[in-house]
Amino acid sequence: MSGGWQRRVSIAMALISEPRILFLDEPTLGLDVLARHTLWEGIRSLKGKVTIVLTTHYMEEAEALSDRIAILKNGRLLGVGTPEELKEKAGTDRFEEAFVFAVKEGTI
């Protein structure tokens, strides 16, 4: 079974018990573009039904899938907000630049 299918099966198994919160740790790590796209669609389909806590090192993934984002460094919370709020606070229109700003400045 491919990595993409393994992740989909794992998420499906977790959803069987109808959790209120779903924790996804780096869910697209190592996936190809098509598998990632399919998984993103699945995650988006859960919005409004399940609270999802997702960890990722991919800024485009955080921005595309998140209503609110917490930026952490070494276990310390640097900032939290919507992607738009974080970009505005950093004075940029790119989320990756907002992330870099937060990490370099130690806050956002």
Which sequence ranges carry the predicted segments?
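Broad hydrophobic/π-residue packing in well-ordered secondary structure
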Residues: M1, E26, A90, F99-V100
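ABC transporter nucleotide-binding domains
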Residues: M1-K73, L77-G79
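Short C-terminal domain-edge/linker segments immediately following a structured domain
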Residues: I52, E84-E85, F101-A102
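A generic structural signal for secondary-structure junctions
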Residues: A70, G91, F95, V103-K104
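Conserved beta-strand-loop-alpha-helix hinge in the C-terminal portion
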Residues: R76-A98
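ABC-family P-loop ATPase nucleotide-binding domain
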Residues: G106-I108
